[in-house]
Amino acid sequence: AFYACRNLTRVALDGCTVLETIESYAFNGCYQLSGFDFSQLTALKDIGESAFSNSALAGDIAFASGITQLGRNAFSGCRNITSVDFSKSTQLTVISEGTFRYCQNLKKVDFSNCASLNTLNIGAFDNCPALEEVVIDNGFYTSIDGVLFVVDKASLLLYPAGKKAEAYTIPSTVKTLGERSFPYNESLMELTIPESVLTIKGEAFYNGSFSGRGAKVIMKAEKPIGLSQSIGLENALVYVPKGFAKAYRE
């Protein structure tokens, strides 16, 4: 509808109580669009693919209760968004791949009270270097100090790229580290992986998370974890239990 309207700066939404869908690419390429109050759109359910990609939306964004899903790359490249609040969005069910990709100043995403959110694609937060915390606790996902897990804490899904901690010990409940669960984080210099971890999925440590910068990974398990693909630790400092270095190399 407004695709590539490069001089559009604001959309007045006063009294807009029946709008249910914002279609794919609706405001894509509106590079100066900064005024758009989603909290007024009480009937809004769906935001389509790349609907607001590369717009100038900025600051804190809050959604009303009716939103159910955000499409692929819906807000990708919105570099000035600093936080997203879904705490009133009790019907939210789907966050798609790339939804907030390249939102370089995004620090916090709040999913508290999103009891129906059952599809949270971790690729939604690709290349969000400032992200410090994801807040959620429902029947599908939970977070501890901003770190995202499945609800039983058996799988660690995302350690945010902007989290400010020099060291982190993975909880002993964790059995699996998910794909791209540890993006590059310049603050994190020491990661301890407990014996409970049995599976590390492909590219768990990506974008050079621990490579060539002095950061170290401490493996507590004596028996090496079997790997079928690259996890991204090829050039990292990895410490293993004394006497088991050969087993890890093999």
Predicted regions and their residues:
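Structural signature of tandem-repeat unit edges
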Residues: R6-T21, Y31-D46, A56-Q69, R79-V94, ...
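Consensus positions within tandem repeat domains that build extended binding/scaffold surfaces
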Residues: A1-Y3, E23-N28, G48-A51, G71-S76, ...
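Short, aromatic/basic amphipathic alpha-helical patches
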Residues: Q229-G232, K246-E250
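Predominantly extracellular/luminal carbohydrate-interaction, adhesion, and secreted-enzyme modules
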Residues: Y3, F205-Y206, S230-L233
